[in-house]
C-alpha cells in the first residue's frame, strides 16, 4: 500500500435538530483547513443520513494522525460541538488493511 494511507480516523457526528445545514457548512469549510495539513493524506466530509455526518481521513503514520488531532479542524470541531451536535463526536482510530488509491493497484498493508 502507498505510504500515504497506513492509519485512519472515522468521526461520527449527530447534528442537533435544526443544525444539519450548519454541520454541512462546517464540513465544507473544514476542507480548507485540512488542505494545510501535510500529513493528512485523504480527508472526506460525509453525510450518512439526514442528521448523521462523518469525517474519514487517512495518514501515513501515527505522528500524522496525532498532528491532525491537534490541528485546526479538530480545535474547531470541539469548539463548535456543544452548539452543533446532539452528542460529543465519536472519534475512532483505525488501521488501514487494504486500499485502492489513485494511481495505485490494490495492495495489502
Segments the model singles out, each with a brief description of its role:
Residues 1-7, 42-52, 77-109:
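Glycine-rich beta-strand-turn "strand-cap" elements at beta-sheet edges
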Residues 16-18, 48, 60-62:
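Short coil/turn motifs at secondary-structure junctions
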Residues 11, 23, 43:
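GIY-YIG nuclease signature motif recognition
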Residues 14-24:
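Short, surface-exposed ligand-recognition loops at beta-strand->loop->(often short) alpha-helix junctions
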Residues 2, 29-42, 58-93:
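An amphipathic, aromatic/His-enriched active-site/gating alpha helix that lines ligand/cofactor pockets
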Residues 6-14:
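Active-site-flanking beta-strand signature of metal-NTP-handling nucleotidyl enzymes
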Residues 10, 27-28, 56:
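Residue-level detection of beta-strand scaffold positions
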